[in-house]
Amino acid sequence: MSDVIIVGAGPTGLMLAGELRLQGVDVVVVDKDEEPTQFVRALGIHVRSIEIMEQRGLLDKFLAHGRKYPLGGFFAGISKPAPAHLDTAHGYVLGIPQPEIDRILAEHATEVGADIQRGKRVVAIRQDTDNVAAELSDGTTLHARYLVGCDGGRSTVRKLRSTSVFPASRTSADTLIGEMDVTMPADELAAVVAEIRETHKRFGVGPAGNGAFRVVVPAAEVADGRATPTTLDDIKQQLLAIAGTDFGVHSPRWLSRFGDATRLADDYRRDRVFLAGDAAHIHPPMGGQGLNLGVQDAFNLGWKLAAEINGWAPVGLLDTYESERRPVAADVLDNTRAQAELISTAAGPQAVRRLISELMEFEDVKRYLTEKITAISIRYDFGEGDDLLGRRLRNIALTRGNLYDLMRSGRGLLLDQGGQLSVDGWSDRADHIVDTSTELEAPAVLLRPDGHVAWIGDAQAELDTQLSTWFGRSARDRA
């Protein structure tokens, strides 16, 4: 029997597998596909996800296979330069196709001991007070203490949960998308696309790597369902209707369509079954937030689930996964809905778009929207206190090295600039680092394994209270 079954070997599931294995949790990942998908659902990662990869020592691998791009233009495609200053060492978006992201995360998960089994579909889920069982399409059954559905927007796990609710907003527009070859010369193509995008923001034809082009074009009508596959002829017809040319598209690698509806699961946990990533929330791909949202779900859930399995989680810790992450997803759904409205060709939304564009001339407005899209403005509600409380702490330089290099183990961390504090009683769960930084005013900060600030201060009694809140009873009390 495993500790955790993860259903879905995409970025969310693979990130979660790596996080759990860092804490010694026995993990099996199952995925319905025989081979890793080459379907490029996402093209890069934003600032907070870049920081997460750095916290786990994976960033160099991502940088080796990606390309840095400026952060401007990520809110509804409004072309404005990035803010002059962001509270991060990584003020860029890293362009890297999802298959490459999946490959790096799968290699990491395997290296730390995760068992990844492909070509196995979950067909039934049963759970009792102690365990959960997943019946697979090959007739076998896996048993574990917990199961996490990371199997995408059409999640089987979500559907198999009893009385699961996944309400949807109304779809008002559909978009066709795919990767294929084109014959139109590059200069001519760029000129045509630039002209069309003056009025059609849901339109694009551009390089996707490996000689292919990604084509995005409004669909002729909203589909009643997603059962009918998109064809190359569908895309050609819409290109001709909107651009007056089909760009000579041919040899599609993959084709799909998406709508602008949003959906958010009514709960992220049903006893021993959790949802993460697109299984819990879906939205239009505005601002490139979807993959990042799922990776950050996994980063939040991983250490908490490991704490429960390893026997030191305080009461209610697992419940904070939903209370922290669901509001974040709701905010992403809101901002993608807003962006979807702003790319409409109707006169009203276009007037609002022009107004937003004017407002983005103000540095504070531009920074606010950029921090929202890149997820570095997230602040979990830990109660009243310093503005840093509940936020992630960016990588800061220390006298000896830097902060994120000290977080690769996935443990909690007390950064103590005065050297007067102690984590005695919690040293099996949190590291105590005595060091100083010119970039941090607080005398000491307690960081959760996901890098969010759980406490700021210099009083040992207050620190002990927060250590108990996030890391359970001290070893002295458990003895």
From Swiss-Prot:
Gene Ontology terms, MF aspect: FAD binding; oxidoreductase activity, acting on paired donors, with incorporation or reduction of molecular oxygen, NAD(P)H as one donor, and incorporation of one atom of oxygen
Keyword presence, Oxidoreductase: yes
Gene3D superfamilies attached to this UniProt entry: 3.30.70.2450, 3.40.30.120, FAD/NAD(P)-binding domain
Reactions accelerated catalytically: rifampicin + NADPH + O2 = rifampicin para-naphthoquinone carboxamide + NADP(+) + H2O + H(+); rifampicin + NADH + O2 = rifampicin para-naphthoquinone carboxamide + NAD(+) + H2O + H(+)
Enzyme class: oxidoreductase
Residues noted as binding FAD in the record, renumbered to the chain: T12, D31, K32, R41, Q98, V122, T156, D278, L291, N292
Source taxon at top rank: Bacteria
Any matching Pfam family: FAD_binding_3
EC id: 1.14.13.211
Required cofactor(s): FAD
Keyword field: FAD, Flavoprotein, Monooxygenase, Nucleotide-binding, Oxidoreductase
Protein family membership: Belongs to the rifampicin monooxygenase family.
Function: Monooxygenase that can modify rifampicin, thereby inactivating its antibiotic activity.
Protein name: Rifampicin monooxygenase
Protein encoded by which gene: iri
